[in-house]
Amino acid sequence: MRYTSADFGNTKSEFDLEVPKKLIHRELEHTAIAEDFSAQRKHAVFVADLPSRTLSLTIGHLEPGQTTSRHRHSYETIIYVLEGEGYTLVEDQRVEWAAGDAVYIPVWAWHQHSNTSKTNLCRYVACENAPLMQNLGAAVREEFG
């Protein structure tokens, strides 16, 4: 059912709890590489296969000296750097980061991530509200060029 502003008074007073069967994705970095998405992004991306309808979680790997494709999307992203150092280019602003830092990517901002190390892997967790935007029919992603 789709609601409009006229349906505001029809909000339920009770909630029906629905606990999904799948509540855990074990060994994410060993079981869930998203081959097509990784190829498009030009770096390894591991996607948590969980039933969230509003949030996604991925782990990204950037090899030494590697840079992702430049892209933008209609959903927000927060990245937490697990290990490594580098920078994220957000529009024309260079944001330097290292392990322990969190980086915010705003909606529809061109961005790309770079590992500045010549020897060490970079690993990061990305949390996005992409499933929410997909369910609302408002998710858009564009690669640069």
Where are these regions (language model features)?
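A short, N-terminal "cap"/entry segment at the start of jelly-roll beta-barrel domains
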Residues: M1-T54, V140-G145
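Conserved short histidine dyad/triad with adjacent acidic residue
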Residues: Q40-H43, T58-R72
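Short, charged/polar surface micro-motifs in flexible loops or helix N-caps
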Residues: S52-T54, E63-G65, E85
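Short, conserved secondary-structure segments in the cores of folded domains
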Residues: T58, S74-T77, Q93, D101
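Short beta-strand His + acidic residue motifs that chelate non-heme Fe in jelly-roll/DSBH
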Residues: T68-R70, T88-L89, I105, H111-K118
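Glycine- and acidic-residue-biased ligand/ion/polar-headgroup-sensing regions
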Residues: Y75-G86
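A short hydrophobic beta-strand segment most commonly corresponding to one strand
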Residues: I78-Y80, Y104, T119-A138
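Short acidic-glycine-tyrosine-enriched beta hairpin
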Residues: D92-W108
